[in-house]
């Protein structure tokens, strides 16, 4: 019997704004490299009578930018007030979280509806196993992005988050994966039976969201298949086991007892304010991909790979400009940045910014290949060494240290070719019988004997002269 199974998924994504001070006080937002409970004050630990400052303007500007880049309609000339969202948990010292009403609404990103974008304060960090709370994080500005339940598979949700985090890197001033947290909302329909919505709280990675949705899809299907009922509930993600466990029945808005915060004046966004933020907005990854294809004439797949890493895309443009911005320069930049450099980065699990390489390093390497100082094979070795040394050594320094310049002495090349011919009887026989490709095996032998320092075209020329007589 075939199964009729479908799912709906929506996400609530929380991303920290990289500000110097917290949302409602002047305490630093650094909470990772300091002793617990040192970057705190009466405001961020909820002392009675402590009054918050007006919200951090940079945090508001970043929320506006995120909302605009997600295609939201901005809430203009209306009161955007902060509410008190009440719940009891050790990481929330005041007993409520200050969270704004929407700043932007009704957006769309990658075909997924964006319900709203708003600002709120991050709670502290509670460690139940130790019974300790660190309030250094309490009050750090958070932007929350709430999506419509438009995602139909774990894979779609994973790709949505990947592209969203890429957008955050382009925007800047946002702390991405590692500090991002997502609440997943999932419901399924199985053989005509509709299950209730289940929320899984505080999943802190793209991989985690994917695993949660895969697990819940199977768990909920099995419950319905056995004739059970999916509870409307909130569940916790047990990351070490990659499973979810029930926490409590799902809250409603009434359970949080929202009230306007009497200590904070409403924000009123004007068209001028939004336009000023818009003027500072960067090019989106999607627009950059399109421009790369149109401006440089490169393939869509190449543009997608380059744009996936903001720094890599910037290096590509700078290298192309240095190489003359012509067809040959573009082709070389694609080969050595999109293909070779990206290969080495993926192998070493690095982003470009972690290598300390500069555009001029890539220009120097490519020029060394263009002017035949080194062969393409050696170029691949040098790029691996450049990444390994984290930019401490230039391509020329590495070439000289390793003695990898192209062999220009014809007699040395001829000796290597003669030795390769002696050891390649079968390939020579096949070549003489008309199999031109058999010569590649002999060329490979020469490259091995010369440690890649021979120019392949020169080797082919010498081999043909010696074999053909």
UniProtKB/Swiss-Prot annotation:
GO terms for biological process: glutaminyl-tRNAGln biosynthesis via transamidation; translation. The keyword DNA-binding does not apply. Keywords: ATP-binding, Ligase, Nucleotide-binding, Protein biosynthesis. InterPro entries: Asn/Gln-tRNA_amidoTrfase_suB/E, Asn/Gln-tRNA_Trfase_suB/E_cat, Asn/Gln_amidotransferase, Asn/Gln_tRNA_amidoTrase-B-like, GatB, GatB_C_1, GatB_Yqey_C_2, Gln-tRNA_amidoTrfase_suB_CS. It holds the Pfam family GatB_N. Its EC number is 6.3.5.-. It catalyses: L-glutamyl-tRNA(Gln) + L-glutamine + ATP + H2O = L-glutaminyl-tRNA(Gln) + L-glutamate + ADP + phosphate + H(+); L-aspartyl-tRNA(Asn) + L-glutamine + ATP + H2O = L-asparaginyl-tRNA(Asn) + L-glutamate + ADP + phosphate + 2 H(+). The keyword Transferase does not apply. SUPFAM superfamilies: GatB/YqeY motif (SSF89095), Glutamine synthetase/guanido kinase (SSF55931). One of its GO terms (molecular function) is glutaminyl-tRNA synthase (glutamine-hydrolyzing) activity. Coiled coil: none annotated. Heterotrimer of A, B and C subunits. Allows the formation of correctly charged Asn-tRNA(Asn) or Gln-tRNA(Gln) through the transamidation of misacylated Asp-tRNA(Asn) or Glu-tRNA(Gln) in organisms which lack either or both of asparaginyl-tRNA or glutaminyl-tRNA synthetases. The reaction takes place in the presence of glutamine and ATP through an activated phospho-Asp-tRNA(Asn) or phospho-Glu-tRNA(Gln). Belongs to the GatB/GatE family. GatB subfamily. This is Aspartyl/glutamyl-tRNA(Asn/Gln) amidotransferase subunit B. It comes from Methanococcus maripaludis (strain C6 / ATCC BAA-1332). The gene is gatB.
């Amino acid at each position: 019997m075939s199964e009729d199974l479908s799912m709906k998924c929506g996400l609530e994504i929380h991303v920290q704004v990289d500000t110097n001070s917290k949302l409602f006080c002047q305490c630093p937002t650094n909470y990772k490299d300091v002793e617990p409970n040192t970057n705190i004050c009466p405001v961020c630990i909820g002392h009675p009578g402590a009054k918050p400052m007006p919200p951090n303007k940079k945090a508001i500007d970043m929320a506006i930018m995120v909302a605009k880049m997600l295609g939201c309609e901005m809430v203009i000339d209306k009161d955007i007030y902060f509410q008190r969202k009440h719940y009891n948990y050790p990481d929330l010292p005041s007993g409520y979280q200050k969270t704004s009403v929407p700043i932007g609404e009704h957006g769309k990103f990658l075909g997924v509806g964006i319900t709203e974008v708003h600002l709120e304060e991050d709670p502290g960090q509670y460690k139940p196993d130790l019974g300790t709370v660190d309030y250094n994080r309490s009050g750090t500005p958070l932007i929350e992005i709430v999506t419509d339940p438009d995602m139909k598979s774990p894979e779609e949700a994973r790709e949505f988050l990947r592209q969203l985090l890429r957008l955050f890197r382009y925007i800047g001033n946002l702390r991405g994966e590692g500090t991002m947290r997502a609440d997943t909302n999932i419901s399924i329909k199985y053989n005509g039976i509709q299950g209730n919505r289940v929320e899984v709280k505080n999943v802190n990675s793209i991989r985690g969201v994917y695993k949660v949705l895969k697990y819940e899809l199977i768990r909920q299907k099995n419950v319905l298949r056995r004739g059970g009922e999916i509870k409307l509930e909130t569940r916790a993600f047990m990351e070490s086991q990659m499973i979810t466990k029930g926490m409590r029945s799902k809250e409603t808005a009434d359970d949080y007892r929202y009230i306007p915060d009497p200590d904070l004046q409403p924000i009123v966004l004007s068209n001028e304010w939004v336009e000023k933020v818009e003027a500072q907005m960067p090019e989106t990854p999607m627009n950059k991909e399109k421009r790369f294809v149109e401006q440089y004439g490169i393939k869509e797949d190449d543009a997608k790979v380059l744009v996936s890493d903001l720094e890599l895309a910037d290096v590509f443009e700078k290298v192309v400009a240095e190489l003359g911005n012509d067809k040959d320069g573009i082709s070389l930049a694609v080969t050595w940045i999109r293909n070779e450099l990206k290969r080495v980065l993926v192998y070493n699990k690095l982003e470009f910014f972690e290598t300390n390489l500069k555009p001029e390093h890539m220009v120097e390497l490519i020029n060394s290949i263009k002017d035949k100082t080194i062969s393409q094979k050696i170029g691949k070795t040098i790029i691996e060494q450049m990444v390994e040394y984290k930019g401490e050594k230039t391509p020329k320094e590495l070439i000289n240290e390793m003695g990898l310049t192209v062999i220009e002495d014809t007699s040395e090349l001829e000796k290597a070719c003669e030795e390769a011919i002696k050891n390649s009887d079968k390939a020579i026989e096949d070549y003489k019988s008309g199999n031109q490709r058999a010569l590649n095996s002999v060329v490979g032998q020469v490259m091995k004997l010369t440690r890649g320092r021979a120019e392949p075209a020169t080797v082919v020329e010498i081999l043909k002269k010696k074999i053909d007589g």
